[in-house]
Amino acid sequence: TANPVIRNIIGQPKSTFNIRQIMDEGKILVVNLSKGLIGEDNAGILGSFLVTKIQLAAMSRSDIPDIKDRRPFYLYVDEFQNFATDSFATILSEARKYGLNLTVANQYISQMEETVRDAVFGNVGTVISFRVSADDSPILAKQFEPQFEPNDLLQMHNRNFIINMVINGEKAPAF
């Protein structure tokens, strides 16, 4: 690659950090995948690569027999659509049992492939929505029924949101 940042990252014979160790020891890993810094294609490739490495590290925690002994690890993904692959759909469906907790942010539902979208809505415990487009409101309104309708999502004021949560395994009313 012509980008020196990318070349320095992927051109190393050995990684300087261990994602499994970061998970197990409760450390923090922050990765800046700014498109302005490394370019859109490079950000997507590195992000997908990193997500796969995190998935593999999380799944390797199966060597800790008791789920309660798996230290929780939190993965936050902004601009989720850039990394939303079928592999990510697998992470969404299996993450909890490996102690991997996910928070993803996305601007438009249509930016996700259908399989990923189904995995997101089938596996999330909390959905937060600000004002959305006419295309997204019918899809998201299903998450907030019966308290809210599609039109409610279209007409929200700035800095207001609707939230739906699962509390102690039970779906709480949206508010």
Model-derived features: positions:
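P-loop NTPase motor domains
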Residues: 1-100, 116, 153-157, 161-172
